[in-house]
């Protein structure tokens, strides 16, 4: 597989896949899904550059973008990454905001147990997270 946890793809294999006529390519460059361990080695920019060169500047996808340091994200974008998935980060901020709402007892006040109220802080936290990521990724006001 091309994007298993921490694996690094072969640029020649990426070229063969790109030559099939796909629109985007998600290739492993040391990225993983979920939370990154403290001893994570980071993204392999040398391989990313070779993949970008081999695939003719095809838009690349970075799975497991949550938790990758901003500078690494910027470097990946400069080397052809056009789409970055950050689902884990959104899930974590949603859970944290919802947990805070409940721990503060707001679900016990009035109709605070209404799912629309109970889940609203999590929804707002996701919106804030996505806006921050859009700014980091340079995708604000882009189609």
Residue ranges and their predicted role:
Residues 1-2:
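Short, small-residue-biased leader/transition segments that mark boundaries at the very start
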Residues 5-17:
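Active-site glycine-rich loop that binds ribose-phosphate moieties when present
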Residues 8, 19-20, 40-62:
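Alpha-helix-loop-beta-strand connector modules within alpha/beta enzyme cores
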Residues 29-36, 79-97:
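Glycine-rich phosphate-binding active-site loops on the catalytic face of alpha/beta enzymes
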Residues 34-52, 69-73, 92-101:
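Active-site-adjacent beta->alpha loops and helix N-cap segments on the catalytic face
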Residues 60, 65-81:
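Catalytic cores of alpha/beta
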């Amino acid at each position: 597989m091309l994007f298993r946890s921490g694996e690094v793809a072969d640029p020649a294999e990426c070229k063969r896949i790109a030559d099939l006529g796909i629109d985007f390519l998600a290739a492993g460059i040391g990225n993983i899904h979920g939370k990154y361990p403290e001893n994570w080695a980071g993204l392999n920019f040398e391989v990313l550059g070779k993949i970008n060169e081999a695939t003719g500047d095809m838009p690349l996808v970075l799975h497991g973008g949550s938790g990758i340091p901003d500078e690494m994200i910027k470097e990946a974008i400069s080397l052809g990454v056009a789409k970055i998935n950050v689902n884990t980060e959104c899930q974590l901020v949603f859970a944290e905001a919802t947990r805070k709402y409940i721990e503060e007892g707001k679900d016990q006040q009035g109709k605070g147990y209404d799912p629309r109220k109970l889940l609203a802080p999590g929804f707002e936290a996701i919106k804030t997270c996505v806006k921050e990521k859009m700014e980091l990724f340079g995708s604000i006001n882009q189609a």
